[in-house]
Amino acid sequence: MVDTSKIKALKEKSRRTVKSGSLKFILIILVVVIVGLLAFIAYNEISNLQFQEKITLENQKKAAIESINQMFAKYPNDPQKLIYINKIQMANNIEEINEVLEEAKKYISFKNYKIEAINQIKSMYGEYYSLSLSAQELVHKISLAQSTEEIENLLKSVDIEKDIRSIIEKQIDYVLASGDKYYYVEINGKSMFMTRDEILKYKKFWTLSELKSLKITPVSQLNKVAIEISAKQCGKLPHKGDIISIYSKDGSFITYGIIDSSYVILSSISYSESKSTSSNINELGESYSSSSSSSISYSLNNLPGILHATVIDRLDYDKIKKMFGEYGKKLNEIEDDTQIFDENVNYFLIISIPDDKIPDIIQIDPKDIVIVIKSKE
């Protein structure tokens, strides 16, 4: 007979085994699900983090590229700009971007220093830069320099002031080769007439700034104006080569000038003299009286006609020259010796003056001009 109690016990044991296995399976499934969920969450977090880092890196790259564009604002066509931008685009992290930016800053700083040095040299030379091979060679070497120390050594190796003075002195010598006795000199806002020897003397003492402002014009290259004035406006007749100062009657200075030629304006010469004598004679109680008179008159009319007649050989040239030669000089001398001044004499002067003073002379009435003679040949 079958033991029912054993059968029941076996069934109960079987039920417990099945129940325990199901529970384990469920637990395993649950663990797998949880682990999977955690893995998914972790993956999403990591992905989000990586995405954020990527966005941050891209933003940093954009900002860095903008910084590069600002750095190279003065040099938009510099090929180094594209090199730095490419390095930034290839960077894998912010540290690499910062390294590129730092490198670019150093490059721009050195480039600015280099250009500043070149501009300073060109500024010092001014208009003389194109005339100096030394200056151009120096600028070329600086443009190729790789460090500030190299540039500083290049600047120390040259005497820029000496080079500029040498160029200007050569220009002075070239102008003085014209052979003129006088030159119109403009320097630092002042002007004067100087001889060749005076210029050669003073050029050694003029500063570099004065030499740069120097302008020398041979008198032979100045414009000439013709002025008719009275002796009262000038005093003595000035002669060729005399340096004069021209003023207006109100005392304001107009310009310096040099007499190119001067003339006494005469149309005729007249002179008259009369002489009378009388005498009383007593003889044997009788008196006698006698008188006599004489007169001399001299008149030379149409003096310009005499000149023209001499030109066409109607009158002897040597005699006319002997008679009237240096008339103005002799007139000055006789006036000095006698202290008699003829205020009715007029002078015709041809004067060399600076080009920019021509309008000032033309617009003033010759009657309002006063001439002061500064020196004579």
Swiss-Prot record:
GO terms for cellular component: plasma membrane. It comes from the Archaea. It comes from Methanocaldococcus jannaschii (strain ATCC 43067 / DSM 2661 / JAL-1 / JCM 10045 / NBRC 100440) (Methanococcus jannaschii). The chain crosses the membrane at residues 23-43, 251-271. The keyword Secreted does not apply. The keyword Plastid does not apply. It is found in: Cell membrane. It is a multi-pass membrane protein. Keywords: Cell membrane, Membrane, Transmembrane, Transmembrane helix. InterPro entries: DUF515. This is Uncharacterized protein MJ0835.
